[in-house]
Amino acid sequence: ASFLSSKNPVADLVKLNDTDVDYIHVDIMDGKFVPNKTMPYSELKHIYKYTSKRLDVHLMVEDPKKYIPLYAELNTEYITFHVEIDEDIMECLEMIKKYSIKAGLSIKPNTKVSELIPYLPYIDMILVMSVEPGAGGQAFIETSEDKIKEVRSLLNSYNIPAVINVDGGINGDTVKRCKNCDIVTSGSYIVKSDNFQEKISSLR
């Protein structure tokens, strides 16, 4: 579950503790890699004290190395950053692994899947963006279904056990187009509803 569209994240996190959601997806934006910017780490750290769930941290930032040590302190399962950054990707992946956290790479809708190939042996997750990153409530991009299949084929051809996560515009209808993935990340569909568990169950 993602909180980009949440009006009251603390209350929503407490409600999610009573569901069977697998992870809390944490979107971090620096106002440079994407136009929007998230609140400071000091505030986010306070908010995420209220969840008992493991965190799936998505860094939409130009320099992941500044953020990895901070979010490694939390109850974090995955830290994912974008393959499109200009920084040393291997250095960032190694830093995440140093904290015994699973490392992932995220890929924008218009980025070629082949960009991931050099890093496949070192990643635990590929986060396929099914919207342009940086804002909640967007519609699922139709070509994402083919991209998910392409990523699955790539992992199979290289015999890589990484999981595929799909993020953006996920609801009870669009989830049917994500059959080749392992995890879906949904925000507005869950947090804007009256019954979190009902919406989560509809995505399984």
For each feature predicted by the language model, list its residue ranges.
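Active-site beta-loop-alpha junctions enriched in small/polar residues
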Residues: 2-6, 29-31, 60-64, 84, ...
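Hydrophobic faces of well-ordered beta-strands that scaffold small-molecule active sites
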Residues: 1-2, 24-26, 55-59, 77-81, ...
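N-terminal active-site wall of soluble small-molecule enzyme domains
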Residues: 25-95
